[in-house]
Amino acid sequence: MLLGVNIDHIATLRQARYATMLDSFNVEPSVLDAAYAAQRGGADSITLHVRGDRRHMQDADALSVRESVALPLNLEMGNTPEMVDFALRLKPDYICMVPEKREEITTEGGLDAVFHEKDLAPTMARMADNGIQVSLFIDPEVPQVEAAARLGAPMIELHTGCFANHSGRERTEELARLKRAAELAHSLGIQVNAGHGINYQNLEQLLAGVPYLHELNIGHTIVSRALFVGMEQAVREMRQAIDRLS
């Protein structure tokens, strides 16, 4: 199973101090150094989200990681003309289409692929024409998986936030939803990834309950752990946990 490391919150920390002076010589922490550390720790890919409001990752961050880090790059992005143009300039290995709300702290739910199907189709076609694979970040619901299949998405990322944020019976119900969605996607020939809220504590339950997972995209818990053990070691611990449990 592959581990994609999301390094957005390295940029979040940097922006807390240097948002208005990114050209300063002493800006820290370095997004590029975090990507290198993730690579040394065993990451299989780097994920970053360039949001429309540029609240954390900047265009220059994505471009520097793409140019310098020898790992596949996954760009999370909203389906806007601006971001489509940027993705075509960046040429990541793949993109993950996500919803965006300016008032949210982080992405709060999956993209409604059913509602936005007509808007997504031309974007996905443009990306395919440029050799960029497209994933859709969706809630684990049958209609969403079916919409992804109609759009010809080669992969999806199941939103695991509800699983992560609940316990007891509600978490069991979320696991069942994830399992059904993963099984359906697999039967339709769609690669199944997962992300949002996955941490060192809930990883075992997720992997035991959801089949056919190909890649996990994990960020906040790794960056949080890195505050105490360093980025490379935090990634290594997650890599070892995935290898042990999968």
UniProtKB/Swiss-Prot annotation:
<feature type="binding site">
    <location>
        <begin position="8"/>
        <end position="9"/>
    </location>
    <ligand>
        <name>1-deoxy-D-xylulose 5-phosphate</name>
    </ligand>
</feature>
<feature type="binding site">
    <location>
        <position position="106"/>
    </location>
    <ligand>
        <name>1-deoxy-D-xylulose 5-phosphate</name>
    </ligand>
</feature>
<dbReference type="GO" id="GO:0033856">
    <property type="term" value="F:pyridoxine 5'-phosphate synthase activity"/>
</dbReference>
<feature type="binding site">
    <location>
        <position position="56"/>
    </location>
    <ligand>
        <name>1-deoxy-D-xylulose 5-phosphate</name>
    </ligand>
</feature>
<dbReference type="GO" id="GO:0005829">
    <property type="term" value="C:cytosol"/>
</dbReference>
<feature type="active site" description="Proton donor">
    <location>
        <position position="196"/>
    </location>
</feature>
<feature type="active site" description="Proton acceptor">
    <location>
        <position position="49"/>
    </location>
</feature>
<feature type="site" description="Transition state stabilizer">
    <location>
        <position position="157"/>
    </location>
</feature>
<comment type="subunit">
    <text>Homooctamer; tetramer of dimers.</text>
</comment>
<dbReference type="InterPro" id="IPR013785">
    <property type="entry name" value="Aldolase_TIM"/>
</dbReference>
<comment type="similarity">
    <text>Belongs to the PNP synthase family.</text>
</comment>
<feature type="binding site">
    <location>
        <position position="17"/>
    </location>
    <ligand>
        <name>3-amino-2-oxopropyl phosphate</name>
    </ligand>
</feature>
<feature type="binding site">
    <location>
        <position position="197"/>
    </location>
    <ligand>
        <name>3-amino-2-oxopropyl phosphate</name>
    </ligand>
</feature>
<dbReference type="InterPro" id="IPR004569">
    <property type="entry name" value="PyrdxlP_synth_PdxJ"/>
</dbReference>
<feature type="binding site">
    <location>
        <position position="6"/>
    </location>
    <ligand>
        <name>3-amino-2-oxopropyl phosphate</name>
    </ligand>
</feature>
<dbReference type="Pfam" id="PF03740">
    <property type="entry name" value="PdxJ"/>
</dbReference>
<keyword id="KW-0963">Cytoplasm</keyword>
<keyword id="KW-0808">Transferase</keyword>
<dbReference type="GO" id="GO:0008615">
    <property type="term" value="P:pyridoxine biosynthetic process"/>
</dbReference>
<comment type="pathway">
    <text>Cofactor biosynthesis; pyridoxine 5'-phosphate biosynthesis; pyridoxine 5'-phosphate from D-erythrose 4-phosphate: step 5/5.</text>
</comment>
<comment type="function">
    <text>Catalyzes the complicated ring closure reaction between the two acyclic compounds 1-deoxy-D-xylulose-5-phosphate (DXP) and 3-amino-2-oxopropyl phosphate (1-amino-acetone-3-phosphate or AAP) to form pyridoxine 5'-phosphate (PNP) and inorganic phosphate.</text>
</comment>
<keyword id="KW-0664">Pyridoxine biosynthesis</keyword>
<protein>
    <recommendedName>
        <fullName>Pyridoxine 5'-phosphate synthase</fullName>
        <ecNumber>2.6.99.2</ecNumber>
    </recommendedName>
</protein>
<feature type="binding site">
    <location>
        <position position="51"/>
    </location>
    <ligand>
        <name>1-deoxy-D-xylulose 5-phosphate</name>
    </ligand>
</feature>
<feature type="active site" description="Proton acceptor">
    <location>
        <position position="76"/>
    </location>
</feature>
<feature type="binding site">
    <location>
        <begin position="219"/>
        <end position="220"/>
    </location>
    <ligand>
        <name>3-amino-2-oxopropyl phosphate</name>
    </ligand>
</feature>
<dbReference type="InterPro" id="IPR036130">
    <property type="entry name" value="Pyridoxine-5'_phos_synth"/>
</dbReference>
